[in-house]
Amino acid sequence: MRRVAAIVEYDGSNFFGYQGQPDVRTVQGVIEDALERIFKQRIYTQAAGRTDAGVHANGQLIAFNCPNDRMTTEDIKNAMNANLPDDVYVKKVFEVPKNFHPRFDVKKRIYHYFIHTSREKNVFLRKYAWWFPYELDLEAMRKAAKYLEGTHDFTSFKTGSDERDPVRTIYRIRILSLGKDMILIRVEGRSFLRRMVRNIVAALVKVGLRQWEPEKLKEVLEARDRSAAAGTAPAHGLYFYKVLF
């Protein structure tokens, strides 16, 4: 039996997150339902990231064991897309080594977060960017972001329910202006704690509003206490953009 991987994009608006759960609509659930229709047996998948409800993906990576040796990777891609709903699309299918695991073999994960700063709401962006109609100091945010790059204990930026090792490495944070009304925060790292990126975004916004000095993020990081940080940015502005492996 061969092992294949797929790059998947999805609109997370109508999903209760990526990970399969009983009685609710999840991305993993609809993918495995589609695979069952194709191969006439339950196929279990693994993924590079478990996005929360409302979070989108441009480049989620999944892998599974394929019981059909005759289908080409293009055949598998086409069959999956024919059986998936409109808010999920398989961009590419390719073969990987039999022991490949997307969660453990990925070297870098990249997340994008979009903030729409126009004074006027755009109803077409309401599910795809955080509408935040206030001026943000991007230079101050960039200075603050530097304190988060590198290997640190990110306890202050995780949810209380995440019991994993809080030490994580952020390779780079970029804060870009996309025209006058859209800001992109790009976070690159090996792996992330639950809601870590959204909690980082909320803290950077505090700096952008000049409610915190950039150096405050160093204090928050060193506190290793979730209550020392800001809130959590909304899910719908976040995209699991890409993985490198």
Curated annotation (Swiss-Prot):
Gene3D superfamilies: Pseudouridine synthase I, catalytic domain, C-terminal subdomain, Pseudouridine synthase I, catalytic domain, N-terminal subdomain. It comes from the Bacteria. Substrate binds at residue 111. GO terms for biological process: tRNA pseudouridine synthesis. Its EC number is 5.4.99.12. It is an enzyme of class 5 (isomerase). GO terms for molecular function: RNA binding; tRNA pseudouridine(38-40) synthase activity. The active site is at 52 (nucleophile). The keyword Protease does not apply. SUPFAM superfamilies: Pseudouridine synthase. Keywords: Isomerase, tRNA processing. It catalyses: uridine(38/39/40) in tRNA = pseudouridine(38/39/40) in tRNA. The keyword Isomerase applies. Belongs to the tRNA pseudouridine synthase TruA family. Formation of pseudouridine at positions 38, 39 and 40 in the anticodon stem and loop of transfer RNAs. Homodimer. This is tRNA pseudouridine synthase A. It comes from Thermotoga neapolitana (strain ATCC 49049 / DSM 4359 / NBRC 107923 / NS-E). The gene is truA.
